[in-house]
């Protein structure tokens, strides 16, 4: 079951908004053979020009679903977010099923909550001579091949992705090059 943590910036999350988000995004459960035990982190922010920004992150065992949308209408924005997340799930499941058939495995796409922690660095001690890290994230690396890592990177909308390479058991990084192609950095211990 997907549980929801919904937070509003400059906006009070009413029962109507909460119910609409839970109803729309909760429909993602139909894409799973076993309903995942996950927490959907939803952040809704309003701006002075009445525009809203909706961010949804659902960390699962094998993939992190993430979508962001800006819209003048909150409910239309939620609908667009739901469409983006559904496309991500369908794309990921298609790729996994294709890989399973190619390998002869009978893998089932099962999603569970992964532990993810974000910490914000205190900005009070800013010094022009120091390098300032403004955000720090901690997450567990998952074993996968480079193709899966590129898919995960694209699903998250990032320009790079760090993972444990199944073939080498080492930490690797895939990244999007300026020419639109992908690069792979493999690490080794010295």
From Swiss-Prot:
Q: Which GO terms describe its molecular function?
A: ribosomal small subunit binding
Keywords attached to this Swiss-Prot or TrEMBL record, sorted alphabetically, are: Cytoplasm, Translation regulation
Tell me where in or outside the cell this protein is found.
Cytoplasm
- Pfam families in the cross-refs: Ribosom_S30AE_C, Ribosomal_S30AE
| Cleavable signal peptide | none
Q: Name one GO cellular component term.
A: cytosolic small ribosomal subunit
Location (main, coarse):
cytoplasm
Superkingdom of the source?
A: Bacteria
- GO biological process terms on file: negative regulation of translational elongation
Chain's role: Required for dimerization of active 70S ribosomes into 100S ribosomes in stationary phase; 100S ribosomes are translationally inactive and sometimes present during exponential growth.
Q: Which NCBIfam families does this entry report, sorted A to Z?
A: yfiA (TIGR00741)
Subunit description:
Interacts with 100S ribosomes.
Family, as annotated? Belongs to the HPF/YfiA ribosome-associated protein family. Long HPF subfamily.
The molecule here is called Ribosome hibernation promotion factor
Please name the taxonomic classification of the source: Bacteria, Bacillati, Bacillota, Bacilli, Bacillales
């Amino acid at each position: 079951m997907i549980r929801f943590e919904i937070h509003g910036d400059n906006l009070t999350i009413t029962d109507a908004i909460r119910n609409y988000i839970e109803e729309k995004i909760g429909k993602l459960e139909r894409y799973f053979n076993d309903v995942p035990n996950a927490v959907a982190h939803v952040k809704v922010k309003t701006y002075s020009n009445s525009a809203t920004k909706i961010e949804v992150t659902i960390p699962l065992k094998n993939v992190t679903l993430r979508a962001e949308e800006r819209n003048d209408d909150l409910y239309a924005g939620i609908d667009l977010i739901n469409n983006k997340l559904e496309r991500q799930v369908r794309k990921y499941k298609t790729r996994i099923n294709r890989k399973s058939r190619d390998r002869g495995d009978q893998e089932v796409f099962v999603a569970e909550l992964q532990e993810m922690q974000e910490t914000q660095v205190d900005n009070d001690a800013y010094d022009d001579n120091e390098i300032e890290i403004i955000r720090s994230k901690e997450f567990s690396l998952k074993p996968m091949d480079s193709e899966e890592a590129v898919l995960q990177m694209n699903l998250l909308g990032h320009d790079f992705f760090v993972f444990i390479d199944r073939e080498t058991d080492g930490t690797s990084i895939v990244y999007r090059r300026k020419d639109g192609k992908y690069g792979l950095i493999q690490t080794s211990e010295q």
